[in-house]
A protein has these predicted regions:
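Serine/proline-rich low-complexity intrinsically disordered segments, especially terminal tails, linkers
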Residues: 11, 28-31, 115
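Functionally constrained cores in energy, signaling, and assembly domains
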Residues: 14-17, 31, 48-49
Length: 204
C-alpha cells in the first residue's frame, strides 16, 4: 500500500510540475517584458536533509521584492523601498520580524498523516545589510533599464524540525511572496508558482 501511494504521489507530482514549469516560464517572461527592473535571477531554494527529523533550506532571494510582497504589497515598490530604508533601526527590525513571521506561517511540509511541519528559524541578513539592499534596489529602480544592473540574490536560511522522523514523501508549500521559485534537491529540481504553490517532494 505504501509503495502504491508513493507511486501515485510521483505521478501526480510530475503532472503538477509540468504545469508549474509552464507557469513559471510565463511569469518570468511577463516580468521581463512588463518591468524595466525585473530581477536578473529568479528566487531559488536548496533543500537538504540534515537528519531523520530535520531539513535545511538555503534560499537565494530577491529579498527587497519578497519583503515588499509580505509587508506592503498595496504600496508602490519605490515608495516601499524609500519609506522602509528610512525607518529607525527599532522600527525596521520590528517590520522584519513581522515579515519573518508571515513567511513562516505559510511555509511547511505536510506529512502523509496530515500533520504539518513548519519551516522555521528563518535567518535573514542583519539590519545594516538589509537596509543597504533597500537603498541599492531604490537606486536601481531609478536607473535606465539599458544599464542591465541588478541586485544579487540574498542568502536566507530556514529549517524544518520535527519531533519525529520526517517521511520520505511529503508535500511542500512555500509562501506566494517567493513565487516563482526554483526548488532544488540532490535528486530533483522543480518550480513552485503562484498558481502551483504545492508539490509532492521525495526527500533523499
Amino acid at each position: 500500500m505504501a509503495q502504491y501511494l508513493e507511486l501515485c504521489s510521483v505521478v501526480l507530482n510530475l503532472l503538477i510540475r509540468a504545469v508549474a514549469i509552464f507557469a513559471a516560464a510565463s511569469l518570468i517572461s511577463f516580468a521581463n517584458i512588463s518591468s524595466a527592473q525585473a530581477p536578473a535571477h529568479p528566487n531559488a531554494v536548496e533543500l537538504k536533509r540534515e537528519s531523520a527529523s530535520s531539513v535545511s533550506f538555503t534560499f537565494a532571494l530577491n529579498l527587497p521584492q519578497v519583503l515588499h510582497q509580505v509587508l506592503a504589497p498595496q504600496v508602490a515598490y519605490g515608495s516601499f523601498l524609500q519609506s522602509y530604508a528610512d525607518l529607525p533601526d527599532s522600527a525596521f527590525d520590528k517590520e522584519i520580524a513581522k515579515a519573518v513571521k508571515g513567511l513562516g506561517a505559510k511555509a511547511y511540509f505536510t506529512l502523509p498523516s496530515g500533520a504539518k511541519v513548519n519551516i522555521e528559524k528563518w535567518q535573514l541578513p542583519d539590519t545594516q545589510l538589509l537596509r543597504e539592499s533597500f537603498k541599492v534596489s531604490l537606486r536601481l529602480l531609478n536607473m535606465p533599464p539599458s544599464t542591465g544592473s541588478h541586485l544579487d540574490p540574498v542568502s536566507v536560511r530556514a529549517q524544518a524540525q520535527a519531533k519525529t522522523p520526517i517521511s520520505k514523501v511529503v508535500q511542500l508549500q512555500l509562501p506566494t511572496a517567493l513565487h516563482p521559485i526554483l526548488v532544488s534537491l540532490s535528486n530533483d529540481k522543480f518550480w513552485l508558482t503562484e498558481h502551483i504553490p504545492i508539490a509532492i517532494v521525495q526527500l533523499p
